[in-house]
Amino acid sequence: MTKVLIVEDQRIHREYMETLLSQEGHYELIPSVTAADVAVQLCKTNPVQLVLMDIAVNGMMDGIEATAKLKDMSPNIKIIIVTSMLDTECLVNAKEAGADSIWYKDASEEALMDVIDRTMQGEHIFPDNSPAVHIGFARSDKFTKTECDILREIVNGLSSRQISEKLDISGRTVDWHIKNLLEKTGLPNRTALAIRAAKGNLFVIKDKPEQGEKNIK
């Protein structure tokens, strides 16, 4: 039996994966957790063989940081990132952290179980492209890389000056790209851009709570 830990803070997705795996005869679920740092501590004392990890979860670290720590601690553990986040940069970071496979929460039961089974057999499964979402009148896959980089930082609450410094481009360039984003999407201002992008799960919002989860569910 393969011991599986689910790390997911959204109840509906957590229970969906629990139900799906409980129907399979060769997977044994240990109690799920909603915080990535709790998952790391749990795996220190439990012989977990597979972790289904969300990226944006509760606790003092996100799913990508937890993946790197788990792989350092137990190189043979299999970790599948199962996420609704569509940020290409985030998925690249997850892969670099050591994730064995990455898949999306809205996948069919058959597709998700196929990824899980193949990962346990030693394969690495990664989506070819992030699904496109509509931001106003525009599809996210029509944005340039620089537009995506700037929009990501707008979602994370940075000012134009801060974006300029972080991306090492001029403030005028930042404003020009924001103007293009507003024209493409038909949205009235950068606040509307941030709200639409956040609602579409286009980027991870880098806002951590002050304290990790205390209880294991």
Locate the predicted segments by residue.
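Basic, Lys/Arg-enriched C-terminal extension of HTH/homeodomain DNA-binding domains
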Residues: 182-217
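Acidic, metal-coordinating helix/loop segments flanking the phosphotransfer/catalytic sites
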Residues: 32-50
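Acidic catalytic/metal-coordinating carboxylates
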Residues: 35, 61-65
